[in-house]
Amino acid sequence: GVACRCDSDGPTSRGNTLTGTLWLTGGCPSGWHNCRGSGPFIGYCCKK
């Protein structure tokens, strides 16, 4: 999957560890949660 920035990763994507996985459709898989809040973002940033 493609890494994405969770809210807990920090304010920018430069120099931070991206701990989320990008899911484009259907929300996060079972057992995962959306770790990204509101904002201009396509899909869901999911984390185990």
Swiss-Prot record:
Q: Which family does it belong to?
A: Belongs to the sea anemone sodium channel inhibitory toxin family. Type I subfamily.
Q: GO:BP terms for this protein?
A: regulation of signal transduction
Its annotated compartments are: Secreted; Nematocyst
One Pfam family here:
Toxin_4
The answer to keyword Transcription regulation applying to this record is no
Disulfide bond entries: 4-45, 6-35, 28-46
Report the protein's function. Binds specifically to voltage-gated sodium channels (Nav) (site 3), thereby delaying their inactivation. This toxin has moderate activity on Nav1.1/SCN1A (EC(50)=about 300 nM) and Nav1.5/SCN5A (EC(50)=307.00 nM). It less potent on Nav1.4/SCN4A (EC(50)=820.84 nM), Nav1.6/SCN8A (EC(50)=about 900 nM), Nav1.2/SCN2A (EC(50)=1449.17 nM) and Nav1.3/SCN3A (EC(50)=1458.42 nM) (when measured as the increase in the slow component).
Keywords for this entry?
A: Disulfide bond, Ion channel impairing toxin, Nematocyst, Neurotoxin, Secreted, Toxin, Voltage-gated sodium channel impairing toxin
Q: What is this protein called?
A: Delta-actitoxin-Bcs1a
Identify the GO cellular component terms for this protein.
extracellular region; nematocyst
